[in-house]
Amino acid sequence: MDDYIAHLPDWQQRICGEVRALIHRADPEIAETIKRSVQPCFVLDGNVCALLATKDHINLFLYDPTMADPDGLINQGQGNATARTIQIYEGDPIRDDALVALLRAVIARNRAGGWRRLNG
């Protein structure tokens, strides 16, 4: 994960570092891994989220397509079958408390059996 982030432009390193810290604030037990040979993922009783840098933004994939988003952070992937996305562009503010709340919701559903089981 450190290597992935280190090779990004400075502004993307800052965003990834801040988001990474918030992910661990949501639950210190979250583990970091690389999936699909390049994608930083965070897991705890299942996939929680993943980061992916693009040319002009960072995608934060949240692995629960059925989760509520009371603060309106999710801005892509509403119709996706497995994840919804928060796209973060250079200069975008990161709403720390709202993001931590979303992450904690995914973790709670993972611990309860995962969104597929809960919605199935």
Please state what every model-predicted region is:
Residues 1-120:
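Charge-dense, helix-prone N-terminal extensions
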